[in-house]
A protein has these predicted regions:
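Conserved AAA+ ATPase small/helical "lid" subdomain
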Residues: 1-65
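C-terminal engagement/docking regions of AAA+ P-loop ATPases
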Residues: 54-200
């Protein structure tokens, strides 16, 4: 059982995505399946996610709520539990782990049956979304500029605190990336068919 510090909230969509990481890793041909995927992968990842949420709350204030982006803080916890095949070694462990996380979000998103067409259409018009670090209200304000995004997030968060709403909105975006409806650079979300830009 993963240790989650008292007071840290891990929303269902984050918890399910953590569990899905282990499932996706077991299906990924770049992962050495003869070595197996450790049962501890999901436990280690959830502990990193919870610690990341706690650290953010200490730095910026607000409630300690786990967000999808916290899973990327856990990439070392994933790479440390995977043995890679030759192809995976060529691509690099971090890239493989990052893609596994994205596919995990994409796997979990459909279970919520959210209306995401307006969100995808917004990005297909050439718009980008960059979420500011730390400031929950500013990030929600940025999300409000994407038609349908906060509505989808509210359907998940059901009137919870702003931190939970932000976590839900991030999950919708990451789920769409995982389903290849959007792409994600280092700092921003954009339409899937645009080439990814890692230098900005």
């Amino acid at each position: 059982e993963a240790y989650v510090p008292e007071g840290v909230l891990v929303p269902e969509w984050v918890r399910l995505s953590v569990e899905a990481v282990a499932f996706v890793a077991r299906e990924d041909r770049r992962v050495d399946q003869t070595a197996g995927v450790s049962q501890r992968l999901a436990i280690s990842l959830l502990e990193v996610v919870a610690a990341s949420a706690e650290r953010r709350a200490l730095l910026h204030g607000g409630r300690p709520v786990a967000r999808p982006l916290d899973l990327y803080q856990g990439l070392p916890a994933i790479t440390g539990k995977l043995e890679l095949e030759y192809e995976g070694e060529l691509q690099g462990a971090e890239r493989v782990a990052r893609e596994i996380v994205q596919r995990a979000f994409g796997l979990v998103l459909p279970r919520y049956r959210l209306r995401t067409e307006p969100i995808v259409a917004h990005f297909e018009e050439g718009n980008l979304l960059t979420l500011p670090e730390g400031d929950v209200e500013e990030a929600l304000k940025a999300m409000a500029g994407v038609p349908g995004l906060l509505e989808a997030a509210r359907a998940l968060a059901e009137g919870e605190a702003p931190e939970v709403l932000l976590s839900a909105g991030e999950f919708v975006l990451e789920g769409l990336v995982g389903r290849r409806k959007l792409s994600r650079g280092e700092a921003s979300y954009q339409a899937a068919e645009r080439p990814r830009s890692y230098g900005n």
